[in-house]
A protein has these predicted regions:
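Substrate-binding pocket helix/loop in short-chain dehydrogenase/reductase
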Residues: 90-91, 98-103
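Conserved glycine-rich Rossmann-like NAD(P)H-binding loop of the short-chain dehydrogenase/reductase
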Residues: 28-44
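Active-site helix of classical SDR
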Residues: 114, 154
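C-terminal helical subdomain
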Residues: 178-179, 194-233
Length: 233
């Protein structure tokens, strides 16, 4: 499939990977709806497209994102969920507030967004499109990591949700894709909800990770495990 001319919603578009998706998809000619909690950060992207401001964990905001795409472009052909939050430390150090936030941002937000987007994605398929919905569970969904147990858990749940929901939604012509790259050099680990990041080895390039994912979307791939990113730097 070609992504040129397709209407794509990017949730978390001002984060490390979200920003890279916005830049690369804009260069490919996609029609973007850029969703973020921060209007100033969204404005600083300098990327053409519709803007949707709001916290994805709040009621009605995922629907607002989708409606913005429909109002601007008349259709929705793809959704990328790049929102995320991380925390570090032994399980005994986590507060309920941090545990709840990890679930809300990483997992529940995607569930709500996909629910809101499904009718529009199904309409795209009915009109001959090849709609997709992309999540980014990361390598911790394959290899849960000590010191990141709650984060590993919510990302594993994100992956499992995608597998099951993908079996449902393929009947409507919607392709769900989950990407599980290894540690990537974004700023996510510099701003944890709790704890401090360990000394990770050098991570993958966000540019190359996103290039690989976009290639997979264009090629019709349905799953991008960590092995898909082997050899990237």
């Amino acid at each position: 499939m070609t992504l040129s001319g397709t209407s794509i919603l990017i949730v978390g578009s001002t984060g490390g990977l979200g920003r890279e998706f916005a830049q690369q998809l804009s260069a490919r000619g996609a029609k973007l709806t850029l969703a973020s909690t921060s209007a100033p950060k969204l404005g600083s992207l300098g990327i053409a497209g519709a803007s949707a401001i709001g916290d994805v964990t709040k009621p009605g905001i995922p629907e607002h994102y989708v409606q913005t795409a429909l109002d601007t472009f008349g259709r929705l052909d793809g959704v990328i969920y790049a929102a995320g939050a991380v925390a570090f430390g032994p399980i005994g150090d986590y507060t309920d507030e941090v545990l709840d936030a990890l679930w809300q941002v990483n997992t529940r937000g995607w569930m709500s967004t996909l629910r809101a987007a499904t009718p529009s994605l199904a309409a795209s398929a009915a009109e001959g499109g090849s709609p997709f919905a992309l999540s980014l569970s990361g390598v911790v969904a394959e290899a849960p990591t000590a010191g990141m147990a709650p984060y590993s858990a919510v990302k594993s749940a994100l992956h499992s949700f995608g597998v099951a929901a993908g079996r449902e939604l393929r009947r409507q012509g919607i392709r769900l894709v989950d990407a599980r790259p290894g540690h990537t050099e974004t700023e996510l680990s510099l701003h944890p909800l709790a704890g401090s990041a360990p000394a990770f080895p050098a991570g993958l390039s966000p540019q190359k990770v996103v290039e690989r994912i976009i290639h997979g979307l264009e090629a019709g791939e349905k799953d991008l495990p960590s092995s898909s990113f082997a050899g990237l730097s």
